[in-house]
Amino acid sequence: MKKNQFLKESDVTAESVFFMKRRQVLKALGISAAAFSLPHAAHADLLSWFKGNDRPPAPAGKPLEFSKPAAWQNNLPLTPADKVSGYNNFYEFGLDKADPAANAGSLKTDPWTLKISGEVAKPLTLDHDDLTRRFPLEERIYRMRCVEAWSMVVPWIGFPLHKLLALAEPTSNAKYVAFETIYAPEQMPGQQDRFIGGGLKYPYVEGLRLDEAMHPLTLMTVGVYGKALPPQNGAPVRLIVPWKYGFKGIKSIVSIKLTRERPPTTWNLVAPDEYGFYANVNPHVDHPRWSQATERFIGSGGILDVQRQPTLLFNGYADQVASLYRGLDLRENF
């Protein structure tokens, strides 16, 4: 497997970000209440810069046993653990980047049931222990690119989705894979209150073409930084598709269903002109409200010191995945 393009040491997310008092900075910058009328995705990052000093701790899940295949151990500098666990989009726990870390402790992840059904010869049901014991786990250092034009580099731990799907034996009718997050309003305040949850229709759903799901890069992820996923990162199991925008990485999955038809996906239902089904990272296809040509890392000096770098086609994984889309108009099928 070819090496991915490297990032500079200076581009790494630093150890501190949530250090400025929101009210003080908003006042200093003259940001008025009108800013809050912007669509959420356009201002969510801005507001998250102005958190206090109550940063959540790094992941504290149980240690996992895993290998480190050389193909996935590259020279990409890692985003610090406290940023991966403390700067998240998980609207089931609130809209602000720090809300998931603050609120996701209410999610009960054991016991857990994950069902694989639909166009398969052998439907499966996995429990919590199966997720970490049934398949050999490996650490993979992947880029993570949010549609909001920020990015991280994360050492995920998991197993290839194709190994799980192979056990279920997809039928010849299977063309797509549909994923569904747990629906538990009593544990997830955003599912209970539309204001907290951004007005989305829950449970959160996502989907892939079958060939995308079977690609070796597509990872069923159960850990990060050597330990089990914390709830705010999608415990106990989430999807990572590194060449796609982060909203494709559905969290806290309870259902995987193979289908004949393309499944609905949450953000595409909300705004089909802004969030496509494919959601491949592409610097040449802008979001209607912002450019995707560059991306930003959360810097150490605050909002005025953010460092930007060019966005890579397919998030730097073009050598591995571009053939999946041969002949497909990437502007039309965004």
Curated annotation (Swiss-Prot):
GO cellular component annotations of the record: periplasmic space
Binding positions for Mo-molybdopterin per the UniProt entry: N88, Y91, E92, C146, T181, N233, R238, G249, I250, K251
Disulfide bonds: none
Description of post-translational modifications: Predicted to be exported by the Tat system. The position of the signal peptide cleavage has not been experimentally proven.
Record-linked InterPro entries: MsrP, OxRdtase_Mopterin-bd_dom, OxRdtase_Mopterin-bd_sf, TAT_signal
GO biological process, one term: protein repair
NCBIfam families found in the cross-reference section: PRK05363.1
Assembly information from the UniProt record: Heterodimer of a catalytic subunit (MsrP) and a heme-binding subunit (MsrQ).
This protein's name: Protein-methionine-sulfoxide reductase catalytic subunit MsrP
Natural source organism: Escherichia coli O6:H1 (strain CFT073 / ATCC 700928 / UPEC)
